């Protein structure tokens, strides 16, 4: 019997997409609540004083620090004619956000991988082909009405004493290594499906269904033809291969701004060999992600696409725990390039690094970060490859490893003219490359430099880039979350 490759959907897919419909619903609910309040006489003699409301203080997200809003001079502080670096900073401002204290570790990313594994097992335990235990999937509400099915996470997987069908379901996500003969998790099955609503595209006037609302200048004629939009979708073939397509069609409603992605979440452990030819890095390939000794090291071999999938899962994981209160949190995401640089430099427009000095070491010769101190010498700073996160002192914002250790993905797309294209208020340039786009359109900005880079390349004011589907032994990531605050 051919084994099916299962794809796991995030819980967000079981909810109405949060587009303008969702936002309108939230506003309507708020207005309804306000209208149901007791209509007390105004203490201002009939003057409009506004509706009442409780104060709100956002709790600190686990493992994150608050980066207060601020302005700074973004870009190279100091030029270098030898390397073609031109000092051309520009003033920008960013709003407040939460940022992970450290890079995402192997341990945290494993939690994501194991969640996907357990989701597949639960899906199969509910499948009639594996015994059909209906307790693992909820298909009716409390009144017995049919609903869109979702997995029951309150039902534990029978790891210790499974019956025959349960054992088949559990073992179906594992494979026997043809070389070692050991049973191991099958990475090819670990696919995560998620949906992202494109709020920016949905808000643009040119994409409104009502032509009279696309242009307010009455001197300009507006076509009655429906706008043409592009959206990403994905599916699995019968062989279990991921297929991605970009569809262009006439706009029909908010659901057309909902993009679907399928991402295999397992890191590329072979990156250690492919990044360094003629080097003995096999132990890293075998052990770096799988061995518990590396749990607190930054995850690597993760593409920009996988980092985004993790961010979506992390958001959904928290919202599922918070219940109704979860709708009020901002999603976890990759930082914009401007946010990343501001956090790395701790808002200091004069600093090239996360520290104030121009050298990467103090007066005692102790290094401030994990990088390549000199040609051929990786170990002078005490490490050969990556180091445990938080090994070195944090910057003035309390954030660790913003220089060296691993370079970090940002959400920002790369183009040579990016500084001319972006605003000076929360600057960001996004380009969702279609599958058919030239490869150069799939470049994303990475920041911070890594354990393999010289001091020049771990400067906080310099950018680099990588293709969004590449998985490198020197690129990881961390998350941010926009602050809900009005101080």
Predicted segment positions?
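N-terminal secretory signal peptides that target proteins for export/translocation
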Residues: 1-17
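Sec-dependent N-terminal signal peptides
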Residues: 18-28
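C-terminal motif of bacterial Sec signal peptides marking the signal peptidase cleavage site
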Residues: 34-35
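Functional-site microenvironments in short loops/helix caps that host divalent-cation chemistry
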Residues: 40-45, 66-67, 71-73, 78, ...
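Post-signal peptide N-terminal segment of mature Sec-exported envelope proteins
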Residues: 44-70
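Short capping motifs at secondary-structure boundaries
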Residues: 97, 104, 113-124, 313-321, ...
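Acidic helix-start/capping segments at beta-turn-to-alpha-helix junctions
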Residues: 121-160
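Short, structured beta-strand segments at or near domain termini in extracellular proteins/domains
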Residues: 473-487
């Amino acid at each position: 019997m051919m084994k099916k490759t299962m794809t796991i959907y995030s819980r967000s897919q079981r909810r109405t997409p949060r587009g303008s419909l969702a936002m309108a619903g939230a506003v309507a609910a708020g207005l309804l609540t306000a209208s149901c309040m007791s209509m007390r006489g105004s203490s201002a003699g009939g003057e409009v004083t506004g509706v009442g409301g409780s104060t709100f203080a956002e709790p600190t997200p686990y493992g994150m620090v608050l980066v207060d809003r601020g302005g700074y001079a973004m870009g190279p502080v100091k030029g270098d004619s030898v390397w073609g670096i031109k000092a051309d900073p520009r003033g920008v401002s960013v709003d407040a956000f939460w940022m992970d204290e450290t890079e995402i570790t192997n341990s945290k990313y494993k939690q994501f991988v194991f969640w996907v594994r357990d989701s597949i097992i639960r899906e199969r335990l509910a499948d009639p082909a594996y015994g059909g235990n209906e307790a693992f999937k909820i298909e009716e509400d409390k009144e017995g009405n049919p609903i869109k099915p979702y997995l029951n996470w309150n039902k534990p997987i029978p790891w210790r004493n499974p019956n025959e069908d349960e054992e088949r379901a559990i073992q179906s996500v594992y494979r026997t290594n043809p070389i070692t003969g050991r049973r191991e998790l099958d990475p090819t099955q670990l696919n995560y499906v998620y949906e992202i609503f494109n709020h920016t595209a949905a808000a643009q006037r040119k994409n409104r269904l009502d032509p009279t609302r696309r242009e307010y200048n009455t001197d300009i004629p507006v076509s009655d033809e429906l706008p043409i939009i592009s959206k990403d979708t994905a599916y699995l073939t019968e062989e279990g291969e991921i297929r991605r397509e970009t569809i262009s069609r006439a706009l029909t409603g908010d659901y057309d701004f909902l993009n679907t992605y399928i991402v295999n979440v397992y890191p590329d452990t072979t990156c250690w060999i492919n990044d360094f030819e003629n080097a003995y890095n096999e132990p890293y390939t075998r052990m770096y992600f799988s061995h518990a000794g590396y749990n607190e090291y930054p995850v690597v071999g993760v593409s920009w696409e996988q980092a985004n999938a993790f961010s979506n899962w992390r958001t959904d994981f928290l919202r599922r725990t918070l219940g109704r209160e979860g709708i009020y949190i901002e999603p976890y995401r990759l930082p914009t390039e401007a946010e990343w640089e501001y956090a790395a430099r701790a808002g200091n427009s004069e600093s090239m690094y996360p520290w104030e000095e121009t050298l990467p070491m103090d007066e005692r010769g102790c290094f401030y970060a994990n990088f390549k101190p000199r040609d051929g010498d990786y170990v002078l700073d005490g490490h050969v490859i990556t180091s445990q996160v938080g090994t070195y002192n944090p910057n003035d914002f309390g954030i660790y490893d913003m220089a060296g250790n691993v370079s970090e993905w940002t959400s920002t797309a790369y183009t040579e003219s990016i500084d001319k294209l972006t605003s000076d208020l929360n600057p960001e340039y996004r380009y969702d490359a279609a599958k058919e786009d030239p490869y150069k359109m799939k470049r994303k900005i990475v920041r911070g430099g890594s354990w393999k880079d010289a001091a020049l390349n771990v400067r906080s004011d310099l950018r680099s880039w990588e293709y969004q589907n590449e998985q490198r032994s020197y690129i990881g990531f961390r998350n941010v979350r926009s602050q809900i605050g009005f101080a």
